[in-house]
Amino acid sequence: MKLAVFSAKSYDKHYFDATLRKHHPALCEITYHSFALSSETVSLAQDSDAVCVFVNDQLDAPVLETLYANGVRAILLRCAGFNNINLQVAEDLGFFVANVPSYSPEAVAEFAVALIQTLNRKTHRAFNRVREGNFNLEGFLGRTLYGKTVGVVGVGRIGLAFAKILHGFGCKLVAYDPFGGEEFKKYGEFVELGDLLAQSDVVSLHCPLTEGTRHVINDENLGRMKKGALLVNTSRGGLVNTKAVINALKSGQLGGVALDVYEEEGALFYNDHSGEIIHDDVLMRLMTFPNVLVCGHQAFFTEEALSEIAGVTLGNLEDFVLKRTCKNSLVREGHLVVPTDKEPVRL
């Protein structure tokens, strides 16, 4: 069994190799590619039986058809999201497709809270200021989180972990999720999205990207938000209309924005562009605001999460090889496992 891993970094290789040696020594031979899977690079998977991809790899119909023609039969997503793959085409072609639905919800939840506190208390700016010998506090005034209302959009594993942390801060929690969730009711109440936006001092997104959730944060919904509220997104960049956010920042409707994801991140994130001219004018404009914090999709990036990703991904591959039922399969017995009766808004 030959496995081609795309968008591979040094840490991917470290954890996959370690997991392979310890738990699956005879499972497969791995080839690592540092570049993303796309129509330009798909030919390099022609000698592989399976491919392993990440959030910014491209698996549209032409890529899937080429993979199949070249003998690939299994697609392993080492992430929870699957918006970058055409699952209907994958089903039609007969691919085995599996993801890692939960590799460290606490890691992402903790990072979301860190973004809120960094943005709210301006610790990133304070760090730079004191290094220059300036201990002035002007411009650093924040707000106490205790007693504030925090809106959680999507209370799956990550959203629930986030809610538990903010409950410990003494925040009032409201959530929107058409799936509901009994456990969340221990910490807060469910409301409609419009009510959540109007009530919340902080809005945190914890939902996958679907056609129904794309640009859920747009001009209309930003206008419904409480004036001066903070917006945090650690889920998928396409949930947020960046141009609309810029307008809301300029008008003062938004009090601040913290993004670990960006709708056009595919051409930028996970690579070093410090010696280049970045031509994304929208992102560059966004980062000129003093009340904006942008990170490079690192919320998941902990030792525990990387170990779990490698373990579950290789376990999924073993299920495929041994023809076992895979609990993480997105295409099972010729049918999509993704809900179709209502748009999923949880991770």
UniProtKB/Swiss-Prot annotation:
Query: What top-level branch of life does the organism fall under?
Result: Eukaryota
PROSITE patterns associated with the record: D_2_HYDROXYACID_DH_1, D_2_HYDROXYACID_DH_2, D_2_HYDROXYACID_DH_3
Q: What Pfam families has UniProt attached to this entry?
A: 2-Hacid_dh (PF00389), 2-Hacid_dh_C (PF02826)
Q: Which residues bind NAD(+)?
A: R157, I158, D177, T234, S235, R236, D260
- Catalysed reaction, written as an equation: a (2R)-2-hydroxycarboxylate + NADP(+) = a 2-oxocarboxylate + NADPH + H(+)
- What EC number(s) does the entry state? 1.1.1.272
Magnesium among keywords: no
Query: What are the entry keywords?
Result: NAD, Oxidoreductase
Active site residues per record: R236, E265
MF terms (GO), sorted A to Z? D-lactate dehydrogenase activity; NAD binding
Q: Which CDD domains match?
A: LDH_like_2
Q: Which family does it belong to?
A: Belongs to the D-isomer specific 2-hydroxyacid dehydrogenase family.
Q: What is this protein called?
A: 2-hydroxyacid dehydrogenase A
Question: Which organism's genome codes for this protein?
Answer: Aspergillus oryzae (strain ATCC 42149 / RIB 40) (Yellow koji mold)
